[in-house]
């Protein structure tokens, strides 16, 4: 799995990130899992064509001392479709900016 990992988090930093994600993302099916929705204007052509598969999101997993941001763009309604793929350059930039905002707003030093 391609992902971006922020590790060596203190318990307080992890809790602050978890709180940020609760306020700004959709909760996943298990504790510590979140979905960051991708804006329509950065979807790939095939994702735009597959409107019924949307909305599209990337997963985030909060662990004991780290947070993992998946670079796989998933469908909300379909597990197996050609519109599910790794993030494009523009989508990766969106995720990096999202991560930078978390680190800045929550004053994460890790």
Identify the residue ranges that each predicted region occupies.
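C-terminal basic regulatory modules in eukaryotic proteins
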Residues: 54-110
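Short, intrinsically disordered, mixed-charge
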Residues: 19-27, 101-108
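Terminal, regulation- and interaction-focused segments at domain boundaries
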Residues: 1-19
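Short, surface-exposed beta-strand/loop "edge" segments at domain boundaries and coil↔beta transitions
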Residues: 12-15, 43-45, 76-80
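Hydrophobic transmembrane signal anchors and adjacent membrane-proximal interface regions, especially
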Residues: 3-7, 48, 96
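Residues in well-ordered beta-strands of folded domains
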Residues: 7, 35-37, 61, 70
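Long, compositionally biased, intrinsically disordered segments
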Residues: 2-5, 29-33, 101
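Ser/Thr-rich, low-complexity intrinsically disordered terminal regions
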Residues: 16, 22-55
């Amino acid at each position: 799995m391609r992902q971006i990992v922020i590790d060596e988090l203190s318990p307080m930093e992890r809790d602050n990130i978890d709180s940020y994600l609760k306020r700004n993302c959709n909760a996943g099916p298990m504790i510590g899992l979140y979905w960051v929705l991708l804006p329509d204007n950065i979807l790939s052509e095939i994702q735009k064509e597959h409107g019924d598969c949307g909305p599209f999101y990337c997963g985030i997993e909060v662990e004991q001392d780290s947070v993992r941001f998946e670079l796989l763009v998933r469908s909300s309604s379909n597990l197996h479709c050609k519109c599910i793929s790794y993030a494009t350059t523009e989508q990766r930039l969106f995720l990096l900016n999202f991560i930078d905002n978390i680190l800045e707003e929550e004053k994460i030093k890790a």
